[in-house]
Structures are given as structure tokens and as C-alpha cells.
Amino acid sequence: MPFIDENQLSVREMREEEAPVVLEMLKDGFKDTENRLILYILTRPMTLLLMAVASSGLRFILNSFSVALVIPVLLTIVGLKLLLWRSPDLKQIYSYYSIGQRKIWVAVYDQDDICGCVALEPTQDHQTVELKRMSVSRWYRRSGVGTHLLKFFEDHAKKKGFRGIVLYTSVVAKAAIGLFKNCGYKVTGGWNWLGYTIVQEFRKDI
């Protein structure tokens, strides 16, 4: 955990030319969470059972135990990766968050070092905003950048008249979950996979 001078840390709107840097930072964070989430899903009893059934059927078709064992695992991994990366905002991140009240900000240290980001998207009820794309550069994690971004986000949402914040995070993102709980966010739902929660929904009134 690096020591940082909070007086040198600021948050501002992302510039168009900074989009590639932010996208790489998001991808780096995704890889960590994505791999842990896939491992979590693959080791659930129901997933193991389904893959075992699929492997048994493929053995008779392919006449190869090793190939029949590998194919269901590979198909599951590919399917999960496609599902996790199905996000329209990542294709054109700058233009997407330049429409209406959507916003994306970067945390900048020492004037030019981009060390984090967070995005805002209003929900359909116009009372709540969704916190999205919150990420901290690997070198700056656990140094207070995430807390700084979260406070900035909440302050902005309040000034714009929103009454609540909703966000979604993977169950394997322990550091993020800890941060949100410490800042007053409550679990209000989630997404399930074969009966297991893989994404938690958090909400907070502001």
C-alpha cells in the first residue's frame, strides 16, 4: 500500500484522449475479478454436476475421456467471459458518458498520474443514480483513492438532487464490498447463477 499525499489527489472529468488509459485500467481490474469469479462459479457443486453430466455424454460421442472433460469447462469459461464483457459503455467509453447526465471522472495524483475512475448513470426513476466503472490503478490500491472517489461521487449526486445510489459488484470483490459496507451501503439484492449469488446489489440513501 503506497503512501499518498491527499492534497495531491484530485478528481475531474475524464478527457477524450485519456479514454485508452482508463479503459486499460478497467481491463486490468476486470481480469483480477473475472478470473476469481469464474473460478468461484466453476467450483460450485451444481456447476460441477452439470459439467460432469455433459462430460459423460460427450465421452460416448468423442470416445475420448480427456477431450470430453475439457470441452464443458472451456465452453463454460468462454460463455462467462462473453457475458461479463457484454457492456455497451466500454466500446465508446468517452462518448457514452458524455450523453445527458452520464459522467465519468478520473482520480489524478500529482497533477498528471491517473490512478482511478468512476462513472455515473441515472436510473429510469430519475431519483437514483448508478455507480459504475469504479476502479483504482493496481499501484494505488488500498491507499484511499477508492474512498476519495466514492465521496466525490456521493457529493456530486447530492448536488444534482438525486436521493439514492445503487451499484453492483461481484461477490469475489472483497475489498470493494468492504469499502461500500464501511461507507453505509446495504445489500438489497443480487444476480444468481444456478442458485448461487455472483453479483450483489448495494444501495444507499443520500
Swiss-Prot record:
E.C. code: 2.3.1.-
Residues covered by the N-acetyltransferase domain: 9-206
Keywords: Acyltransferase, Membrane, Transferase, Transmembrane, Transmembrane helix
Membrane topology: Multi-pass membrane protein
Domain of life, source organism: Eukaryota
Gene Ontology cellular-component terms listed: membrane
Compartment(s) of residence: Membrane
Molecular function terms from GO: N-acetyltransferase activity
Enzyme class label: transferase
Keyword rRNA-binding: no
Matches recorded under Gene3D superfamilies: 3.40.630.30
Regions that span the bilayer: 37-57, 60-80
Family membership noted in the UniProt record: Belongs to the camello family.
Protein function: Probable acetyltransferase.
Protein name listed in UniProt: Probable N-acetyltransferase 14
Organism of provenance: Xenopus tropicalis
